[in-house]
């Protein structure tokens, strides 16, 4: 399997674990190709759609630091309200854009 596909699957798996730890109900679409990688539902009935991406950074000389490379949502993803989930495979950190609201526990 292509390394990028493998890393994509790892990112989705880490995202699923992250969302489960937030006490969300988590689902994955059957289709391998589509605008959404992961669907999550809160106990209050709120639905969240995610596109999982491997976190990538670029060095910005003017700032002297690395900065996340933000991916662009497709027009369909924008219409659906998909959130981008950047996953760091090495640290298992997940950064969601736009951020999730404070979830009740």
Regions found by a protein language model. Name each.
Residues 28-30, 61-62:
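Short histidine-centered beta-strand/loop micro-motifs
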Residues 78-105:
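Domain-level recognition of nuclease-like catalytic cores that cleave nucleotide substrates
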Residues 15, 19, 38-40, 44-58:
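Conserved catalytic cores of phosphodiester-cleaving nucleases, focusing on short active-site segments
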Residues 32-35:
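Short acidic/glycine-enriched loop/turn segments that link adjacent beta-strands
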Residues 55-83:
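Short, charged, amphipathic alpha-helix that recurs within catalytic cores of restriction-modification
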Residues 23, 46, 79-81:
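A generic structural signal for alpha->beta connector loops
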Residues 1-29:
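Acidic-basic catalytic patches of nuclease active cores, encompassing PD-(D/E)XK
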């Amino acid at each position: 399997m292509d390394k990028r596909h493998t890393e994509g699957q790892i990112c989705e798996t880490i995202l699923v674990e992250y969302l489960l730890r937030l006490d969300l109900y988590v689902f994955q679409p059957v289709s391998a190709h589509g605008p959404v990688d992961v669907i999550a539902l809160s106990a209050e009935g709120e639905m969240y759609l995610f596109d999982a991406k491997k976190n990538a950074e670029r060095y910005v000389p003017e700032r002297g630091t690395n900065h996340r490379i933000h991916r662009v949502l497709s027009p369909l993803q924008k219409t659906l309200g998909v959130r981008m989930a950047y996953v760091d495979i090495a640290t298992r950190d997940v950064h969601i854009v736009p951020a999730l609201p404070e979830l009740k526990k």
